[in-house]
Amino acid sequence: MNAYEVPQPILNSPFEEPKEHWHIVEGETPTQKPGRRPAMYFYRDPKAKPEKDYGSVAGTAIELKLVNRIRDQVKKWRTEGYPGVTRTTHELLQWWRREGKEQRLFFAQLDAAETIIFLTEGRSDFLQGINIPHEELSEVRRQQGFSGFPRYACKMATGSGKTTVMGMLAAWSILNKVNDRGDARFSDVILVVCPNVTIRNRLQELDPTEGEASLYRIRDLVPSHLMPLLSQGRVLLRNWHVFEPHATQTGGVSARVTKAGVEVRTKETITIGSKTTTARGRRYLTMEDLERQVRAGMLTVLSEETGKDGTLGKVTVESRRYVESDTALVNRILGQEVGGKQNILIMNDEAHHAYRIVRENKDEEEEDLFGEEEEAEEFFKEATVWIEGLDRVQKLRGINFCLDLSATPYFLGRVGQHTNRPFPWVVSDFGLIDAIESGLVKIPQLAVRDTTGKEIPGYFNIWHWILPQLTPAERGGKKANPKPEAILKYAHHPIAMLGGLWEKEREDWSKNPEDPRPPVFILVCKNTQIAKVLYEWLAEDKAPTGIPPVKIGGFKNNGTQNTIRVDSKVVHESDSGETKNDEVSWMRFTLDTVGKTAWPTDRVGRPLYPEGFKELAEKLERPDHPPGRDVQCIVSVGMLTEGWDCSTVTHIIGLRPFMSQLLCEQVVGRGLRRASYEVGPDGKLTEEVAKVFGVPFEVIPFKSSTQGQPPQHVRRSNVHAIPTKSRYEITFPRVEGYTQAIRNRVTVDWANVASLVLEPGKIPPEVEVKGLHINNKGRLSLSGPGRIDDVTLKEFRGKRRTQELVFDLARTLTRDYVAQKQCTVPAHQL
């Protein structure tokens, strides 16, 4: 064990306040200290240049002073018996923490819920000196009659139980309001806003009308005698898409504008093209469609630009459309069941999507952050529509307060100097490091050392390792948009290394008859071009020239869909749940069911299909089992969709730039959900691991041991012949192999063949992985408490004989030689 290794990475019980934490200070060895870790975040200027050796992206640690102040006061308030709360609140708090509760709540859940209750009901002397910053509105919005509303953000790591916190606070608010209708601190109408249909469907259990099937009974959040009172409240689940005002015109683009509702005018530049579309943030119209929309009164041409040949190239237009009024929009969102009720409690799930864009112009680093320009534009459109929709609710009905829940409540861009910083209204923090120390999530293992001897190993940040090795033509100019084949030329090596480990893990998992699920491998790419080439290489065995075949059998689509490709466009189109493309809908069902072997069932054992699945399966003539059941590898652009709750991810590779620790946490977070929550004899959760290459996460304090759950014994059956049936015996020859006579001989003049030098200092064949490392130079880099594991090509090579490799090389050489113009020898002779 070296200076950074410890016998037990998980320090705390998930059900109790952390008693210890790893104290990390620049220039010092990490030490185990008593008490809870102070709340802080790591900030790096997104415009800062990466450091040498492929760059550090950790940034500077900055204390969250408001969170630490609130945390201290909540602890005192809790110790003194929650002074100031109502009788209903006190009953719920005691119910959640009672002795003998079978489904104990995680401390992370209790801490977040109690913090919000404290800020609402805490006695004034405890709240003294605590001021939560309000969100700033622009002067234009104020002149339009909008006003801000209180926001409280709880930072909770992926897998720490945000949905349960929403259920706890929904019950608290509704029951208090029902018991005292005049108390404006509480609301009996709760609007839950989420980013996509996946989360919306999963949050259906927050509806009190579900009764015994609701989260309140499944997780034992509300005593049975209070359920009738809880059912008097309303929990509304909506996608952010509903906040976009509906147009009142009908009949398509050729129809006349219906002048009903509110007129909205916008200016934009349109490029005249061969088809009507939107690409890379630009709008294209055919000449025919432009003329049609002008005739319909939808567009007014303000200016024109012609090309050298005199043809119309671009037009600046003013578009005019009529949309529903704010009153109609709010009534549509809240529905008739709510009536005219006011003082709405808002809950934003994945709240980093909901903030005010300060400027319209994009940031220089935007494409590196989101992967593709379209994805960035979609994100900022979502943020704008989401927050402006809440503004309308506040203006017409009033918002009690807004609860923001996210693992990463940060500004992602277009907010000036606030980019990469947390929301100023963050009041509670139980982040990834805390979740790791409490065992709530898997422990990521990252590259810490390889054969190159460099301070930062290449596979720690694969993108920055590859780019300097590319030629200017391969790199793709100043925008660094490399050719996919050039990326794969170097990336195939780390993929083979982790792929070999994945295959071994799949074999180990298959020995457990109680859980037939396979481990899942994820590759996150910069753009759709790289994702396409990778997918064809992995799933279809189509290797680009000069790239060896992948030879990972579990990734090939031979009759089953073992590997899928998920583009950001597919995710965005299906987020609203209203896509008209059947294949896009099917891909959404596939992605949502990765790691699930069967549908949940009702009390009589009938499968509970998600809305629309059964009809789509029948229409496409496909089986009705979960379509993601057999998926073992996902090639994606971006970080996959929020709410993706697959718990069987074991390996992740990033093939894209990472400009912030925020983005690293979002990508790695997709693989951190635990497969099991069994508590060990010491009251702590057992370790689970996810191996990660290419995602430069520098704020993880440690890694886990490789020892997982002991393999289950396989039940064996002895097969033998029955003597009385010997006359039915059938014999077969034992064939050990086949030999084919080769009459043609090919000789090679080795003297004229250039030498191939294998350089382990350039492409590392061995990599060591573990957690965070503080080196003697006093800067954050990879290491920390925990043992080191080796990642090599041993597992990848283990199942391949030398003779097989020789024939593979001969086949590749033959294919390349035959493709050359000067080759005159028929392929069959070679």
Model-predicted regions and their roles:
Residues 1-830:
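RecA-like P-loop NTPase motor core of helicase/translocase proteins
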